[in-house]
Design a protein with these regions (language model features):
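Non-catalytic structural scaffold of enzyme domains
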Residues: 1-230
Length: 230
């Protein structure tokens, strides 16, 4: 079994499912008392979020690249960045850390393609929904077209993420709002929906979505397990 290095803490609420899902995957594959060989570097999300708001993405790239190098020195054999949004600086991490980097959009793209879909809704932070680092990769590498909510909906989705989900708050009102947005995107022709912020899966259970769900945290964790046992 390979040792996986997790870059977490963005927020820590979403890092917990990664650790659980990876260990469950290893136990399911190997049985008995087997558990995952995991190293974790959890950053201070306050610093990362402030850099996001100020547009200081180069600084966040430096922080995460240094964290990845620390995991490499500690014995990690691959890197998993436990957040969708911060894959905006994936290139900065990959350019300085020589370990295999398991990109969340690649794992998600393979899952969508495997389901026979080419047109999906994308929910996440405004950075993930509006910028090209995530949607563009899905289009270029997997020919997947992403539909995103209207501007006012994107603002509300982003607000719920940072003011509720990142703080571990999951309300019925927000759950219903997300379900409403998903239903509207389904009417526009979306075949499935990407939960492109890892805490969304904690808010909206699959049965509340009219579309098949691609929970990126679960997909990414499954990809990590496959890598660890390869």
């Amino acid at each position: 079994m390979k040792t996986i290095g997790l870059l977490g803490g963005m927020s820590w609420e979403s890092t917990i499912p990664y650790y659980r899902l990876i260990n469950e995957g290893i136990k399911q594959r190997l049985g008995g008392l087997h558990s995952a060989q995991v190293l974790l570097h959890s950053v201070d999300f306050h610093e990362i979020e402030e850099c996001q708001r100020r547009g200081e993405w180069d600084k966040t790239g430096d922080i995460l690249a240094e964290a990845a190098l620390g995991l490499q020195r500690a014995g990690a054999e691959g890197i998993v960045l436990c957040t969708n949004t911060m894959h905006k600086v994936a290139d900065a991490i990959e350019s300085r850390c020589t370990l295999p980097f398991l990109h969340i959009a690649d794992a998600t793209g393979r899952a969508i393609t495997g389901a026979g879909m080419t047109r999906v809704a994308l929910l996440g932070t405004r950075y993930t929904m509006e910028q090209d680092f995530y949607r563009g990769r899905l289009t270029e590498q997997f020919s997947i077209n992403c539909l995103i909510p209207e501007a006012d909906e994107r603002a509300k989705i982003n607000q719920i993420i940072f003011e509720e989900l990142c703080l571990g708050q999951f309300t019925e009102a927000s759950r219903a709002y997300y379900a409403q947005v998903i239903a509207r995107l389904a009417e526009q022709g979306a075949q499935g929906v990407i939960f492109g912020y890892t805490e969304i899966g904690l808010l909206v259970p699959e049965e509340r979505s009219v579309l098949p769900v691609f929970d990126t945290a679960a997909i990414h964790a499954e990809d990590a397990v496959a890598f660890m046992l390869s």
